[in-house]
Amino acid sequence: MAAKIIKFKEDARQKILKGVRTLADAVKVTLGPKGRNVVIDKSYGTPHITKDGVTVAKEIELEDKFENMGAQMVKEVASKTADKAGDGTTTATVLAEAIYSEGLRNVAAGANPLDLKRGMEKAVKVIVQELKKRSKTVDDRNEIAQVATISANNDAEIGEMIAQAIEKVGRDGTITVEEGKGFETELDVVKGMKFDRGYLSAYFMTNSESQECILEDAYVLIYEKKISAIKEIIPLLQAVVETGRPLLIIAEDVEGEALATLVVNRLRAGLKVCAVKAPGFGDRRKAMLQDIAILTGGELISEEIGLKLETTTIEQLGRVKKAVLTKDETTLVEGAGTKAAILDRASQIKRQIEESTSDYDKEKLQERLAKLVGGVAVIHVGAATEIEMKEKKDRVDDAQRATAAAVEEGILPGGGTAFIRCIPAVNSLADSLEGDEKTGAKIMARSLSAPLRQIAENAGQEGAIILQAVEKMKEKEGYNALTGEYVDMITAGILDPTKVVRCALENAVSVAAMLLTTEAIVADIPEEKPAPAAPVGMDY
């Protein structure tokens, strides 16, 4: 094992503090409406310009190993906040630095770090209660647009687009953000269920110009296994032909004789039919087929539950008003499933989302939920250059995730105001505590003003003066850094999602308290690389 360097007590804490401050200084310049951009060099391609705190934090790696430990711990604050709430990463970083710096001063003066930690944790519980008490549910489209606008760095166009997307796909719908191909940012909404499987043969196309197969008022056969022999589906085909309606076959695969016969009948006899592979794999495929069955009001034909393809009747088929298939994807519009059955299935999926511990599984379940009850909205981000597009995409991502958080837990007055309104409650708690626990609560009370002070400083104002003014104001009043005025934050549309504020606080305290209780740090001794050998002389 390689030898290690070890640092103890104050020496260790000062090294960590330097790393924390270095990372925080790079991140906090992005906070607020007048926050600045950070340019990140890339080993390939053009530099990345961003105003997204977590993107900046993720790029920071310090040369000094001990300082880097502090930086990496605060990077974790930003990442965790981004994962949970989707925004608030810069706020979390600013809070973590303020709490750690303030706490370190007290530890240096002889305070017990463990008692400070206990005091801080008690204060967090009080602050979270205060935030929840002040939180307002998001009721109208205007508030959704305002939350998105603030998160997108006051870009009203993005805010409006996200509000429009939520209005169209509903609160359970999915909004995805992709790079566009033009200058304009566009919203594309897909109603109904869409999955990434296309027709199995180009001969199924009904429109050769658009290369689509469009089936109106169609029956849908949903089968769990492969279909190879045509004799398995002949009775069902005859029954469907008699109704004069088209048939869409969704199965694990349609191959060989079955596919060839369907194609020949499509071309020669004008049979209105199309076959497509089922979406997903394994258990997820089975679940998605069941979703399609519920959406279309049909049954999943599965031998596991005793249903055979040869004995399937027309009553067991699903129905859709319209099915649109391209070579890559299928969209089912207006299935005949009952609202009660669809909502019941949606509740099941929501329970699975709550119980799941895997982020990947949660994401896939959320996609299924959106396809079942809402729809999918895609925002195509447009810009003149690739650099601008990446910067804008970061902002749209932030706005979209902040909006989802606002819909989930409600909103608070923004601009750091919500934290200021919690200070009296924390001071009351501190009065009921003793010793270093009391000091821990006082540290939290002082640190809560850090985001507001930073927003003011980024706007070119004196943070302490702005703080003094805001403390004397009414509950919802605060400082609008964009205009330099004191306003009613809710009326002015300066809002923060409660979930974002809460997660930023909880993650900041968690890491800052852990760092405060650190007494020793251990790192590898840096290897000294030998100097390169001198080139061989060329004299003959």
From Swiss-Prot:
Catalytic activity: ATP + H2O + a folded polypeptide = ADP + phosphate + an unfolded polypeptide
Keywords of this entry: ATP-binding, Chaperone, Cytoplasm, Isomerase, Nucleotide-binding
EC id: 5.6.1.7
GO process annotations (BP): protein refolding
Database matches in Pfam families: Cpn60_TCP1
Top-level taxon of origin: Bacteria
Subcellular location: Cytoplasm
Subunit structure and binding partners: Forms a cylinder of 14 subunits composed of two heptameric rings stacked back-to-back. Interacts with the co-chaperonin GroES.
Family: Belongs to the chaperonin (HSP60) family.
Function: Together with its co-chaperonin GroES, plays an essential role in assisting protein folding. The GroEL-GroES system forms a nano-cage that allows encapsulation of the non-native substrate proteins and provides a physical environment optimized to promote and accelerate protein folding.
Protein name: Chaperonin GroEL 2
